[in-house]
Amino acid sequence: MRLVKQEYVLDGLDCSNCARKIENGVKGIKGINGCAVNFAASTLTVSADGKEEQWVTNKVEKKVKSIDPHVTVRQKHIKKSADDGYRNRMVNMLIRMAAAVILGAAAYLVQSGTIEFFLFLGAYLIIGGDIIIRAVKNIIRGQVFDEHFLMALATIGAFLIQQYPEGVAVMLFYQIGELFQGAAVSRSRKSISALMDIRPDYANLKTKNGIEQVSSEDVQTGDIIVVNPGESIPLDGKVVQGSAMVDTSALTGESVPRKAAEGQDVMSGFINQNGVLHIEVTKGYQESAVSKILDLVQNASSRKARTENFITKFAKYYTPAVVIIAVLLAFVPPLVLSGAALSDWVYRALIFLVISCPCALVVSIPLGFFGGIGAASKAGVLVKGSNYLEALNQVKYAVFDKTGTLTKGSFEVTEIKPAEGFTKDRLLEAAAYAELHSQHPIAESVRKAYGKMLSSDEIESYEEISGHGIFAKVNGTEILAGNKKLMEREQIEDVPDENAGTIVHVAVDQRYAGAIIIADEIKEDAAQAVADLKSLGIKQTAMLTGDSKQTGEAVGKQLGIGEVYAELLPQDKVAQVEALEAKLLPSEKLIFVGDGINDTPVLARADIGVAMGGLGSDAAVEAADIVLMTDQPSKIAEAIRIAKRTRRIVWQNIGFALGVKAIFLILGAFGIATMWEAVFSDVGVTLLAVANAMRVMRLKNK
């Protein structure tokens, strides 16, 4: 069955509570099996099996309109200026505010109580009529406890106890606050979008008629594009002419440019700093690095952090609870306390209603996490969900694969040790034929060391033995090449113990032929990566390798790794990770870092799987929870630092918002605070929380 996946922009979505309602509403549409609203990015992603795209769009538009008529659904590829809508709303609100202020001022000047009432009522309806209408519509739909209902109830209550000026003023300042909040959220969204907006706008396509500027989506695989100095490379490809220094920071987070010359691969998103590059396109727009990165980051909102889910549930119960307390506060004290005036206690209850809206939390928390994901992507770390970003704070066990992760994986033959009766050339030739069809870096190093032509026609049979090595029959000669386990399995005698490097043992016709010693260089930042993790509170580090125990322990000792598990088959690595996870407390997490070549099962099994080396292996990217765009293990510590900053800022907002609300609830209950102060505190807390949430993007990584 065909899966339809559509992404929409929700123009006018400035209410996080509305975002939650839209997500739940669209999820309830029959035929739609997946939905996620990203409030921070104003996007809605929907998936449906076996449905036409237009059917999905019509259903979504109808449902969104029924939930919030002010939100317009737009397909993502259709461009629209968001500023125009906001500017129109602002002008409209300023006119209404001016009219309300004039009527309110006139009410103070008249002597008649009736005229005063109608002037204040007119001012109230001008400034708050839309809030009343939305509250009534939501009540009809069964959506009672939202900010519109609370403000309508509080201000109408003020009119009922003849506090006309405060009823108008509270609605006026609430609308001003909404305007500022909308501006703050809009600015935050633009900041995050700008941070991640690495998609080139156009491509210079080389045609028979010269160079034509076209959309990147219109370029086909095999086309030649021209990238001038200062331009961004629009599509993945291979340089066929020219050379230049390219800035890769948008993808990798690395500030040092690297050279791109003829024959080298380049990725979309790289910026040409000098020279002119002619590039043959190797991947279409949807398969390019930039598209994959943006897709990963923007879809991260569908995997919400536990804190986000907690705040959503908290808001669901917090608002009704405060309303119930407000009702009790209004009517119980006058019944049990002698001399207590009903109007005084109703006024105090109205303060409860004003302060009960949890906007500061439900707006700033998603922005904080999305900002953290954006900051991580700018540093070359792609986090697939805010749940994984939050989980990085709980990591206590860091487990690394060795080859290609902590070492460069660029093997070189350093020594050839033939057994008695064999020459170095004969030993190397036998190993090269055995490794002819293998794609493993060790096999490539053996073939490179042999350096002569190899004919696959001479190979009569070939078998890769997982975790052991290779069996090949060449011109009637049986060759075994692999580790010591392979020699033991095939009962090869006289196999010596070798301690240095990675060893390929070779046997010819069941007779031991010798050993080839291969060295793998440790990455420059590997030791620092392990040290940084320990400084961040990681309790234990471990390394998994299929190499010999001596080789593994030598690398582990050099890097300061606590535990080394060697001579592991691919399936043994999964079992070992499970055994390590069993040692952890329920609140602790294990992170596994692999290079993505053969680590897919372990990446999928670990609490947090991290694939290194960018988007090269689709299977690894699919299985991993976090993708590093470079081959630097030190990026792990950087990701954890960003995660810790994000958590710190999110909990600052939670503590600040709840603290201020608690103070004003107490002050309101004792009759110390006024409705004016309550609405100022509510608006102020929200604006400060949004501003604080964006700090995560401005903090420099150390």
From Swiss-Prot:
Enzyme Commission numbers on file: 7.2.2.12, 7.2.2.21
Active site (catalytic residues): 401
Binding site for Zn(2+): 15, 18
Binding residues annotated for Co(2+), in chain numbering: 15, 18
Family: Belongs to the cation transport ATPase (P-type) (TC 3.A.3) family. Type IB subfamily.
Domain spans labelled HMA: 4-72
Subcellular compartments: Cell membrane
Main location: membrane
InterPro entries registered for this protein in UniProt: ATPase_P-typ_cyto_dom_N, ATPase_P-typ_P_site, ATPase_P-typ_TM_dom_sf, ATPase_P-typ_transduc_dom_A_sf, Cation_Transport_ATPase_IB, HAD-like_sf, HAD_sf, Heavy-metal-associated_CS
Recorded topology in the membrane: Multi-pass membrane protein
TM spans (from-to): 87-107, 117-136, 144-163, 167-186, 321-339, 346-363, 649-670, 679-694
Presence of keyword ATP-binding: yes
Record-given protein name: Cadmium, zinc and cobalt-transporting ATPase
